[in-house]
């Protein structure tokens, strides 16, 4: 057949390194780093990068893109004859870099908008600044992972499973069935596109249904809301009922307990005073509903405190792993140098260490020299030094942790919080604790977050390459290409979404970015309602002591219920499908999971497109394309003889039924 039999991933051989045989033997030379592989990888990086930004701002979470990209690549590259498994691997490698960089960007850089009024963070929320920080962080994550590859991927093969990387290799090796798998993903994309187009663009039915009690009710200002979106159903199906239930329980506490309680105890005049003290204008307050006023004045900070404490708990829990990772990985540099001369095989060629060092120094120089980034000369020099120190620390940690627990469980938020706390304390100790240095501290946190996120993805991709017989240096250059290409669209997506709908609004609450801003402001300005933040921290600690995941619960406590309830519903749909199918655990390659992945991709990409429609002016600038399209739907809804909320539930229930139908199918892959 021309290739070696792949080693088993399920059992641990006595000497995994010696017995490992990649799918493509090292002595074989097959097409790998080709133009079509780079082109498709870049395209997927752009698409999944934009999709990830949308989802991260909306729900504070992301979905791994490597397996969906591998599935789609296998199908699309079949258009070209003689497409190889190594070309498909390059496609998913480049594409996954876009998704991981987008996650790091969306979790941190929008925090520029939420810093103290005197910090001037908005001035650095520009396309050029976003693109620069994203590119520096993403490339740094790739570079710092290079000297660790031999230690973590090769020497610890059989010890560090790298679950997503191994699963992706299995997908590539099972490429004969790629057409069926890709059809399921494309089907989900098509269904979500049509649904979202009719729903969000043409407004043929409401985007959300809600119930709010009156201020005079027994339970005043209680609110239940459900956003009728395909992407949230897909996310919920992927996460499952347990995580979805934990998330919605946080929203239940906020909107059905805390806000009604505050409504009974806090007078309207006091709420007004507190909002004005937080910097809200009277005009903005007048435009808020009563529930929104209580959320902006109080529960938003309770949620931020909960997320902060949850991140700290996650960091403390992983501290033994972090210490062990550092101890076991610090020898990787010398190990890679010692083995470099003997590495003659194609499958052992890494990017030269000299290039890594030169690249890291060059990135630090870019940070210190560019005027588009925050801080004076001293601030930028400190930013460059702290970026290198914290960057190498948490790239090392992230690269090892994802090998043990997978990228989905990587405590990126905790690492970023630790970076922000350390950076802010360094600045304060040097007398640079004013508001003007908040954007500088946040920039360090953003770069480290992006680097750690991309290092985790890089590790999984290199594990996939190790199993299928890829050339590491080609993957590493592919990752750099994926980072650079995706940064162009990531910045545009953030700009469009903020300009069209407003980041920080109910539509895009950006919970992770709000958390990062809270940490920076808390250390450097002390101008925060600490009482409510500490209440949230105490609640998260209580939830953890009850044996529940504090981060999922805390994110739910911060998010609007309109975001968490549909995720829970999606999880319930998976539970129903599992019961119907008679299988407890569903494979990532099952019809239901692949269809749900398509729903997420189709829904989020169409959501990004709506922001573009919003930016296209019509009627001489008095209107826009999205408003005109939604006007057609409003005219249609006015003719309907039934309640509009009931009408909106009909297509949503049909979509839910379709998800169950796809989920109950037996896995044929």
Positions of PLM-derived features:
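Alpha-helical multipass membrane-protein architecture
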Residues: 1-669
């Amino acid at each position: 057949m021309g290739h070696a039999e792949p080693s088993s991933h399920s059992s641990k051989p006595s000497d995994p390194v010696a017995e490992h045989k990649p799918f493509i033997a090292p002595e074989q030379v097959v097409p790998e780093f080709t133009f079509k592989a780079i082109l498709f990888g870049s395209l997927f990086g752009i698409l999944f990068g934009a999709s990830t930004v949308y989802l991260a701002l909306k729900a504070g979470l992301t979905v791994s893109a490597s397996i969906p990209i591998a599935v789609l690549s296998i199908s699309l590259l079949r258009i070209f004859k003689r497409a190889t498994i190594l070309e498909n691997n390059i496609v998913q490698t480049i594409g996954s870099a876009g998704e991981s960089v987008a996650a790091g960007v969306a979790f941190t850089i929008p925090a520029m908008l939420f810093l103290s009024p005197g910090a001037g963070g908005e001035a650095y929320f520009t396309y050029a600044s976003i693109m620069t920080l994203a590119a520096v962080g993403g490339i740094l994550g790739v570079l710092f992972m290079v000297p660790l590859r031999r230690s973590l991927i090769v020497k610890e093969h059989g010890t560090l499973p790298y679950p997503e990387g191994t699963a992706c290799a299995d997908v590539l090796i099972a490429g004969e069935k790629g057409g069926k798998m890709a059809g399921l993903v494309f089907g989900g994309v098509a269904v979500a596109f049509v649904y979202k187009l009719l729903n969000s663009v043409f407004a043929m039915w409401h985007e959300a249904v809600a119930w709010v009690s009156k201020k005079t009710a027994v339970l005043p200002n209680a609110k239940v809301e459900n956003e009728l979106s395909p992407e949230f159903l897909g996310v919920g199906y992927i996460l499952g009922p347990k995580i979805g239930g934990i998330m919605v329980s946080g929203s239940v506490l906020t909107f059905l307990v805390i806000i009604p309680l505050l409504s009974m105890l806090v007078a309207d005049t006091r709420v007004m005073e507190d909002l004005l003290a937080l910097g809200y204008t009277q005009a903005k307050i007048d435009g808020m509903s009563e529930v929104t006023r209580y959320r902006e004045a109080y529960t938003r900070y309770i949620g931020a405190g909960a997320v902060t404490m949850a991140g700290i708990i996650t960091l403390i829990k992983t501290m033994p792993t972090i210490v062990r990772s550092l101890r076991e990985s610090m020898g990787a540099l010398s190990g890679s140098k010692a083995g470099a001369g003997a590495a003659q095989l194609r499958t052992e060629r890494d990017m030269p260490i000299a290039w890594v060092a030169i690249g890291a120094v060059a990135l630090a120089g870019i940070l210190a020299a560019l005027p588009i980034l925050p801080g004076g000369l001293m601030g930028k020099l400190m930013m460059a030094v702290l970026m290198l120190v914290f960057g190498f620390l948490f790239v090392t940690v992230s690269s090892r942790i994802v090998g043990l627990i997978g990228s989905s469980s990587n405590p990126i938020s905790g690492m970023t919080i630790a970076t922000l706390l350390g950076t802010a304390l360094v600045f304060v100790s040097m007398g640079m604790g004013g508001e003007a240095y908040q954007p500088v501290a946040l920039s360090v946190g953003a770069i480290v977050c992006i680097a750690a996120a991309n290092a985790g993805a890089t590790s999984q991709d290199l594990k996939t390459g190790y199993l299928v017989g890829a050339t590491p240096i080609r993957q590493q250059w592919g990752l750099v290409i994926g980072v650079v290409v995706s940064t162009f669209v990531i910045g545009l997506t953030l700009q469009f979404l903020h300009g069209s709908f407003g980041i920080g609004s109910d539509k895009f609450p950006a919970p992770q970015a709000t958390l990062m801003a809270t940490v920076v402001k808390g250390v450097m300005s002390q101008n925060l309602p600490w009482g409510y933040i500490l209440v949230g921290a105490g609640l998260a600690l209580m939830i953890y002591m009850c044996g529940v995941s504090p981060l999922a619960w805390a994110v739910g406590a911060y998010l609007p219920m309109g975001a968490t309830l549909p995720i829970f519903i999606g999880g319930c749909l998976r539970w129903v499908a599992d019961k119907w199918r008679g299988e407890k655990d569903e494979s990532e390659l099952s019809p239901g999971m692949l269809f749900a992945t398509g729903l997420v991709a189709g829904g989020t990409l169409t959501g990004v497109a709506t922001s573009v429609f919003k930016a296209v002016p019509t009627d001489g600038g008095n209107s826009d394309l999205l408003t005109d399209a939604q006007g057609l739907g409003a005219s249609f809804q006015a003719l309907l003889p039934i309640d509009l909320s009931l009408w909106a539930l009909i297509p949503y229930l049909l979509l839910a039924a379709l998800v169950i139908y796809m989920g109950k199918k037996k896995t044929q892959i």
